[in-house]
Amino acid sequence: PRAQPAPAQPRVAPPPGGAPGAARAGGAARRGDSSTAASRVPGPEDATQAGSGPGPAEPSSEDPPPSRSPGPERASLCPAGGGPGEALSPSGGLRPNGQTKPLPALKLALEYIVPCMNKHGICVVDDFLGRETGQQIGDEVRALHDTGKFTDGQLVSQKSDSSKDIRGDKITWIEGKEPGCETIGLLMSSMDDLIRHCSGKLGNYRINGRTKAMVACYPGNGTGYVRHVDNPNGDGRCVTCIYYLNKDWDAKVSGGILRIFPEGKAQFADIEPKFDRLLFFWSDRRNPHEVQPAYATRYAITVWYFDADERARAKVKYLTGEKGVRVELKPNSVSKDV
C-alpha cells in the first residue's frame, strides 16, 4: 500500500519582478484519512467565553473603507514542500487499506500549526476531518440554508449605500448544540482541541474563548467581500479559523478564492475554498484579505478566538463608552459568552 500524495498548498506569490524562491505563506498539512471569508465582526451575542463581553470597537474615522486589491501577481497552489511552516505529511504509519492515519491533534498543533503561524501568520490544514464527517457538516449547512436560516451579512460601520457593495454573503450564527447541527458542533470542538494544544505558543496571545460559528454562503452570483481586516481596532479577536465545505471546487471556473495580503509584503497568498480544508490566520491588521467573486455556491464556517487581555480591554472600552464614563447596563443587557 502507498501513502497518499501530499496535498497542494497555497504559496505566496513572488513580488513583482519574480524574485526566485519566494517564501510560502502557510502550507497544507493532511489531517484526515481519506480558503471566507472573515465577515461581520461578532458582537456579544455571538461569543462563547466565560463572562460577558462587548461587541467590537467601532471603526474610527482614520480607518479607510474596504478597498479592492491593488492587483499584484497572482499566487498559485503548488506541490507541498517540507520544513517548519510548510506542508506536513501525516505520520503514524498506514492503515491496512493503505489510508494514512489522521495526524494526532497534539502533534498537528505543536509540529505544524504553531511554527507555521509564528513564521507566516497563515496556516492551511487539508483533509481535516475526513470525507464522511465533512459531508455530514455540509449536509447540516445546506439544511440551514434550505430552511431559510441565513440572513444578509452585515457591516459594523455602514460606509456604503449598500452593504452588498462590500460583501455579498448570507450568514447564520451557530452555537453547535442546536438540533440538526451536531456535526457542526463536532467541528467546533475539533477546532477548540487544536487551539487548546497551541495554548501559550501562538505569538504572545493567551487564548481563553471564541465566538460562535459564523456559517456563510456566497450564492454564486458573482458576489464576494472586498479587502478588509477582521479586527482593526482591538476587539479581542486574535486568530481567524475557517473551515471550507466545497467539493470539487475549481477556482479557475468558480472563483471564490480568499486572497490574503500579509502586511508589509509585496506578496499575497491565495487560498482556494476546498472541501475539508481548515485555515488559520492572525485576525488583526497583519492580514488584510478579500473574497474574490464566487460563481458557484460557496460555503464556509468561521470561528474567531479571543486573546484574554485584549478582550478584557475591549470590554472596558465598550462599557465606559467614548468619553470614559461607565455606562450603566440593565440586567441581562449584555449577553453572556456561553
Swiss-Prot record:
Keyword GTP-binding found: no
Biological processes, Gene Ontology terms: cardiac muscle tissue morphogenesis; cellular response to hypoxia; heart trabecula formation; intracellular iron ion homeostasis; intracellular oxygen homeostasis; labyrinthine layer development; negative regulation of CAMKK-AMPK signaling cascade; positive regulation of apoptotic process
Broad class of where this protein is predominantly found: cytoplasm
Keywords: Cytoplasm, Dioxygenase, Iron, Metal-binding, Nucleus, Oxidoreductase, Phosphoprotein, S-nitrosylation, Vitamin C
EC number: 1.14.11.29
Cofactor: how and how many bound: Binds 1 Fe(2+) ion per subunit.
Residues covered by region (Disordered): 1-99
Reaction equations catalysed: L-prolyl-[hypoxia-inducible factor alpha subunit] + 2-oxoglutarate + O2 = trans-4-hydroxy-L-prolyl-[hypoxia-inducible factor alpha subunit] + succinate + CO2
PTM annotation: S-nitrosylation inhibits the enzyme activity up to 60% under aerobic conditions. Chelation of Fe(2+) has no effect on the S-nitrosylation. It is uncertain whether nitrosylation occurs on Cys-238 or Cys-241.
Skewed-composition ranges (Low complexity): 1-11
Induction / repression: Up-regulated by hypoxia especially in liver and testis. Levels up-regulated also in myocardial infarction predominantly in cardiomyocytes.
Quaternary structure note: Monomer. Interacts with ING4; the interaction inhibits the hydroxylation of HIF alpha proteins. Interacts with PTGES3 (via PXLE motif); thereby recruiting EGLN1 to the HSP90 pathway to facilitate HIF alpha proteins hydroxylation. Interacts with LIMD1. Found in a complex composed of LIMD1, VHL, EGLN1/PHD2, ELOB and CUL2. Interacts with EPAS1. Interacts with CBFA2T3 and HIF1A.
Protein name: Egl nine homolog 1
Organism: Rattus norvegicus (Rat)
